[in-house]
């Protein structure tokens, strides 16, 4: 039986994140995107950045993750995908730290498994202790996990992620910023996950102009 307490914890952490992207700026008619104003500077000169704003507590992000993985495998050479974990409340910050900790420990393979742990296995990955225990069960050195989780580097990346979300006017997840100039989402693409990635492809072409 599903735990009522777990459900409440997940609902609290997901508040805002479970709502598909509702743009703060005006959509461009049938073009299925919004302009980001002012445009966002790139952290990767010479490349078109595609930023995926996500939250581990968001079921829509969990659903689209396999599609994003497949899309990234065939992305053009002048495109770089960066996944950006965001927090809509203080309780979600540890999940941002979890993402960057796994990246720092060179375990990006665990990224999709976090979604599975939370949404399928119903694990309570809401604090450092629970996250550390789960990571250890996946073969991660617990001492290294704890050290990196609270490191200055991870804290800096979390802060930068929050700044990116603010600059892109993120109201919900998942959402995609392309070339620092355009934003799309499954909602803008007609409530269609695959459709959102098709719009991303179109915006990449538009960003080259």
Curated annotation (Swiss-Prot):
Keywords: Disulfide bond, Periplasm, Redox-active center, Signal
Signal peptide: 1-27
A cellular-component GO term for this protein: periplasmic space
Disulfide bonds: 58-61
Keyword Disulfide bond: yes
Listed GO MF terms: disulfide oxidoreductase activity
InterPro entries registered for this protein in UniProt: DSBA-like_thioredoxin_dom (IPR001853), DsbA/DsbL (IPR023205), Thiol_disulfide_DsbA (IPR050824), Thioredoxin-like_sf (IPR036249), Thioredoxin_CS (IPR017937), Thioredoxin_domain (IPR013766)
CDD domains reported in the protein's UniProt record: DsbA_DsbA (cd03019)
Localization of this protein: Periplasm
Keyword ATP-binding belongs to the record: no
General function of this protein: Involved in disulfide-bond formation. Acts by transferring its disulfide bond to other proteins. Required for periplasmic assembly of the pertussis toxin (PTX).
Family to which the UniProt record says this protein belongs: Belongs to the thioredoxin family. DsbA subfamily.
Protein name (record): Thiol:disulfide interchange protein DsbA
Species: Bordetella pertussis (strain Tohama I / ATCC BAA-589 / NCTC 13251)
Gene: dsbA
